[in-house]
């Protein structure tokens, strides 16, 4: 693993008492309350009336940090995990150039995407508040604080289950290859993966490698075979899972930040290639398995989601769009987590169905090239060196094929109870059941019945009840509330 020239521990939080919470980085002291604030700037000409435009309205989200801390007064406070920006700057943290930061992973850098609502174009990945990467919970692309707190909250939940195996975040002052000083910490968060956080004076960098998992993604062969991408573990470093996010701005900045999304490939720094098989076994020592039995959302993400999204043969805009579809489906259920909340979804079956084929398809490629709704004319669907671009059968570009519209994604063995209930309602007629191996039964709640499922007497009663023409048949067996 890479090591820098100088390392100095500055944030061993066991001896620090007066640390602020992350809420003080992005909002007032009464964290937990949300408000809409207008960014007011000094008027150059006081005679001209002040006009507020849509871009001048800054929406800042506050999360209940103190409420979470008050629920567990016997444990370490969340505020004891992060040093303050003033403390980091006091350690002579320096400014850095964006080009220098990108040059550290230039050999494994697959794409760079500039995010932010002020950028030109109508790319949905740019206009969205959600970071367009497949992650267990939505992350923010507007500010580093909600993203950092979501990761910290998830790590803290694991600490509450087994305090003896978790340590507080320890930030160290280091020097990068260009000679600039920065603050850094690194830890493993299941099921997300290995997380590295770096603080410069004018940048905050988050690097995540989802291929590092000593419990769900360890290879049992030799060390030489482990470095072979063709015979490695189930999930390897790919642009669809491994990423680096660069937030541009001061550490104490409260306004929205400019963001750069870098997708990383095989062999990137602070990734799975830096860990040998003995290192992964060492990470397991003294730790309890964070994954439960089948039906656990964390287990489902570690196996089903990562295996179903590991292919990185598509272009970066396509991966961004598919990731947004993934998070859009999760956030459509209001009981699932939002930005800044490090909780797992109830299930990822619907999100995987919205993500679509991980290696792409002819139908999706034709739709992508015809609609051009991503704001980039001439953008490719497959990245260079990806899948075969030839597609002999060209379907209608404005709709999916009959097979895509009428089939249901098969149910995975890692599906959660929420996924099984949703799949049963979508795939089976009303009243039909699915009985699992453990004896739990799930009944279909479908409220719409097609004519292919009705007898002549039922059709006649439907006609007498005043419904429309009963002989209008959609021809689909997937009609339902979803």
Swiss-Prot record:
Residues 10-23 have a biased composition (Polar residues). One of its GO terms (biological process) is viral process. The keyword Metal-binding does not apply. Residues 1-52 are annotated as: Disordered. Keywords: Host cytoplasm, Host nucleus, Host-virus interaction, Secreted. Pfam families: Foamy_BEL. The keyword Secreted applies. GO terms for cellular component: extracellular region; host cell cytoplasm; host cell nucleus. Bet counteracts the innate antiretroviral activity of APOBEC3 family defense factors by inhibiting their incorporation into virions. May be implicated in the establishment and/or maintenance of viral persistance. Bet is required for viral replication. Bet binds to human APOBEC3F and APOBEC3G. Bet interacts with host APOBEC3C; this interaction does not induce APOBEC3C degradation, but prevents dimerization and incorporation into virion of the latter. This is Protein Bet. It comes from Human spumaretrovirus. The lineage of its organism: Viruses, Riboviria, Pararnavirae, Artverviricota, Revtraviricetes. The gene is bet.
């Amino acid at each position: 693993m890479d090591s820098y020239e100088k390392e100095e521990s500055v944030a061993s939080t066991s001896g620090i008492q007066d640390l602020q919470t992350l809420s003080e980085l992005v909002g007032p002291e009464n964290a937990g309350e949300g408000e809409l604030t207008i960014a007011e700037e000094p008027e150059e000409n006081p005679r001209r009336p002040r006009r507020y435009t849509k871009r001048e309205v800054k929406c800042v989200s506050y999360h209940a940090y103190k409420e979470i801390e008050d629920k567990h007064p016997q444990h370490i406070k969340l505020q004891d995990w992060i040093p303050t920006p003033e403390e980091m700057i006091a350690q002579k943290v320096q400014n850095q150039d964006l080009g220098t930061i990108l040059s550290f992973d230039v050999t494994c850098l697959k794409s760079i995407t500039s995010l932010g609502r002020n950028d030109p174009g109508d790319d949905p990945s740019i206009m969205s508040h959600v970071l367009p990467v497949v992650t267990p919970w939505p992350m923010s692309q507007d500010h580093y604080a909600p993203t950092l707190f979501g990761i910290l909250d998830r790590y803290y939940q694991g600490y509450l289950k087994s305090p003896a195996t978790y340590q507080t975040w320890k930030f160290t002052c280091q020097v990068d290859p260009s000679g600039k000083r920065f603050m850094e910490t690194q830890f493993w968060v299941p099921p997300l993966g290995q997380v590295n956080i770096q603080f410069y004076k004018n940048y905050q960098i988050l690097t995540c490698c989802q291929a590092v998992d000593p419990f769900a993604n360890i290879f049992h062969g030799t060390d030489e075979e482990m470095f072979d991408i063709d015979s490695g573990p189930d999930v390897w470093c790919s642009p669809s899972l491994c990423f680096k996010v660069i937030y541009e701005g001061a550490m104490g900045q409260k306004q929205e930040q400019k963001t750069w999304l870098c997708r990383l490939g095989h062999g990137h720094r602070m990734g799975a290639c830096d860990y040998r098989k003995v290192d992964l076994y060492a990470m397991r020592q003294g730790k309890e398995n964070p994954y439960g039995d089948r039906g656990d959302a964390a287990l489902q993400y570690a196996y089903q989601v990562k295996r179903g999204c590991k292919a990185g043969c598509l272009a970066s805009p396509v991966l961004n769009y598919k990731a947004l579809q993934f998070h859009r489906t999760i956030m459509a259920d209001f009981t699932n987590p939002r930005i800044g909340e490090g909780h797992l979804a109830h299930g990822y079956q619907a999100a995987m169905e919205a993500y679509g084929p991980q290696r792409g398809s002819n139908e999706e490629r034709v739709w992508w090239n015809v609609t051009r709704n991503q704001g980039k004319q001439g953008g490719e669907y497959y990245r260079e060196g990806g899948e075969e671009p030839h597609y002999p059968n060209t379907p209608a570009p404005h709709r999916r094929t009959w097979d895509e519209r009428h089939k249901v994604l098969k149910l995975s063995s890692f599906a959660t109870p929420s996924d099984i209930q949703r799949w049963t309602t979508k795939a089976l007629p009303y009243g039909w059941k699915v009985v699992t191996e453990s004896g739990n039964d799930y009944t279909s709640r479908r409220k719409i019945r097609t004519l292919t499922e009705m007898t002549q007497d039922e059709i006649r009663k439907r006609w007498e009840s005043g419904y429309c023409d009963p002989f209008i048949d959609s021809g689909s067996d997937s009609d339902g509330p979803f």
